[in-house]
């Protein structure tokens, strides 16, 4: 049966709506005549802004409300920043499509008085804003002389806090800045040697209901196979480590010929212990590559580090 209507669930933040509207426009181009509607809503992660993300909890912080709409048949798909989508999805839902990835790097953004500095030259005591334990742990490892403070709110709110002097610089995803039209605020792209990016960073994931082949077929036009292979390896790595979106686990993937090379990292919260390794294999074996690297890092002590973190960063009741 031909699909005549498609209902999209989305977060209502500015970045989420930019991403969802891009998906909507691309699907309308691919399927002329298809009626597409969007329902935007706030998630738990959007509502709680006075508590560090890791203290709120990790399971579906930015996705659960969208998934609930699909499970009661009020939406057919949900558009996510793939880095926010847990690796284990609710029964009845599936990751139907992964779009072409934007630059997955982390970016340094500075205020007017710090334009002369790069990350590696920031003076001792400079205040760096980040809400990510992954960024925090890696930057503490390389730059223990800097001060790190949590920063919450949407991208525009964070930039306002930076420019008002609350912070000397921020670490944000380059892809999100670009999608919002703030590429000119990127002062420095942070190399992977310093900060491996989050699993799925820079890509969009379209989640859908299982058992609706016409919906899956409609959204597959946005699938980007190289990105999908890279992200499937990254997500398998994260899942095998039993990590989540709010733990210090970083990755990088790249192709060399038909080989997919995955680099992965686990760090302690204080940055003093950082385990990093890489593995490779055929791109068609993406999940196996991720699982293999996770087990390699476990053998080097990653499991003990993560256990300590889970015991330290418990969600607040």
UniProtKB/Swiss-Prot annotation:
PROSITE patterns recorded: PORPHOBILINOGEN_DEAM
EC annotation from Swiss-Prot or TrEMBL: 2.5.1.61
Cofactor note: Binds 1 dipyrromethane group covalently.
Entries under InterPro entries matching the protein: HemC, Porphobilin_deaminase_cofac_BS, Porphobilin_deaminase_N, Porphobilinogen_deaminase_C, Porphobilinogen_deaminase_C_sf
Cofactor(s), names only, from the UniProt record: dipyrromethane
Transferase as UniProt keyword: yes
GO cellular component terms attached to this protein's record: cytoplasm
Keywords attached to this entry: Chlorophyll biosynthesis, Porphyrin biosynthesis, Transferase
CDD domains, sorted: PBP2_HuPBGD_like (cd13645)
Molecular-function GO term, any one: hydroxymethylbilane synthase activity
Family: Belongs to the HMBS family.
Name listed for the protein in its UniProt record: Porphobilinogen deaminase
Organism listed in the record: Synechococcus sp. (strain CC9605)
